[in-house]
Amino acid sequence: MRGETPTLKDIVLFDIPTCETPIDLYCYEQLDSSDEDDQAKQDIQRYRILCVCTQCYKSVKLVVQCTEADIRNLQQMLLGTLDIVCPLCARVE
């Protein structure tokens, strides 16, 4: 192309040869489902949580098994209105 704007003679068209047999573009590859399961299992981890009972102020240990996103949600709930009560205080009420 010469000049600032293209003209019709600047455009070159090529003939695409046609095939007598159609080309199959379908991909017959299948993913192994165990890879997806392994990935999901890797995302789930155990977390140890040490918090304080809101009634008697004793330490309460929790172990949860969840994804990182879920542990972040739990953290936000603990910072909000969610309170943990120890088993002794739970029996009293």
Swiss-Prot record:
Transmembrane segments: none annotated. Highly phosphorylated. The keyword Translocase does not apply. A motif (Nuclear export signal) lies at residues 71-79. InterPro entries: Papilloma_E7 (IPR000148). One of its GO terms (molecular function) is zinc ion binding. One of its GO terms (cellular component) is host cell nucleus. The keyword Hydrolase does not apply. One of its GO terms (biological process) is symbiont-mediated suppression of host innate immune response. Keywords: Activator, DNA-binding, Early protein, G1/S host cell cycle checkpoint dysregulation by virus, Host cytoplasm, Host nucleus, Host-virus interaction, Inhibition of host innate immune response by virus, Inhibition of host interferon signaling pathway by virus, Interferon antiviral system evasion, Metal-binding, Modulation of host cell cycle by virus, Oncogene, Transcription, Transcription regulation, Viral immunoevasion, Zinc, Zinc-finger. A zinc finger (unnamed) spans 53-89. Residues 1-42 are annotated as: E7 terminal domain. A motif (LXCXE motif) lies at residues 25-29. It is found in: Host cytoplasm; Host nucleus. The E7 terminal domain is an intrinsically disordered domain, whose flexibility and conformational transitions confer target adaptability to the oncoprotein. It allows adaptation to a variety of protein targets and exposes the PEST degradation sequence that regulates its turnover in the cell. Plays a role in viral genome replication by driving entry of quiescent cells into the cell cycle. Stimulation of progression from G1 to S phase allows the virus to efficiently use the cellular DNA replicating machinery to achieve viral genome replication. E7 protein has both transforming and trans-activating activities. Induces the disassembly of the E2F1 transcription factor from RB1, with subsequent transcriptional activation of E2F1-regulated S-phase genes. Interferes with host histone deacetylation mediated by HDAC1 and HDAC2, leading to transcription activation. Belongs to the papillomaviridae E7 protein family. Homodimer. Homooligomer. Interacts with host RB1; this interaction induces dissociation of RB1-E2F1 complex thereby disrupting RB1 activity. Interacts with host EP300; this interaction represses EP300 transcriptional activity. Interacts with protein E2; this interaction inhibits E7 oncogenic activity. Interacts with host TMEM173/STING; this interaction impairs the ability of TMEM173/STING to sense cytosolic DNA and promote the production of type I interferon (IFN-alpha and IFN-beta). This is Protein E7. It comes from Human papillomavirus 42.
